[in-house]
């Protein structure tokens, strides 16, 4: 998943055109749209809330399985909202669609970098470290995006203050969307306040992650490695650094050839090429999503059955597709 700041800035870039199309004018609608741009990522943070049953941790499932049906279910879930909730729900759904567009577009580049690093034959580094490598790549891109867009670093731009704003009323509306999305897509029943718990955990973890000088990151990273018996720290890989740089070695700014690890397609697009292309798809995608004809067939046309990783999937599959082998 491109990280929190990249998705937030993508949403801010897309907001004017989406607001114009949907007539979004209130602060709640604005906040709901930007939350939507985080997609199902907040559900990963349910692990930080022991009050929530583990059966609600469906973030990974949503990222990898039945993407077209998920979007069609989200569209249908809007009909279950009260009239007073509908505009907030539509704003969130439009943001969720933007999250999908960016995720499925940028992820092949992220995974190409990840597999290149993990498969490079470096002693003490292999695919068992993929989660930390993936997070490190996305953290670096996040820092680049922040400095490029806001000319700030996390020393002054604190993610836990600047991002994830929404009232409890907005979160309650989004809870209902997740309940119906998961029920209709995966036959899974979530707790009615699942998303609210996830978002509040996400906010708390972002505060914990804030370590611009990396002192807290080094301390907590050492604890994580020691008690988790891990070679590398996921906390250290995810904690933003005070890095005033609008470049990243993972952005392919030199337009070198790289291969999509999921399709074998070879291209030379940079991160910003892909970011801009995804942004260019937003108007037509929003128009299609909110048309009266939108259903699973139209969702398959929109997604091409690519999941949030940009990986082809079986539209009826119940398991995440396997990762590419080293020979592919």
Q: Which residue stretches match the model-derived regions?
A:
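N-terminal leader/auxiliary helical segments
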Residues: 1-95, 100-328
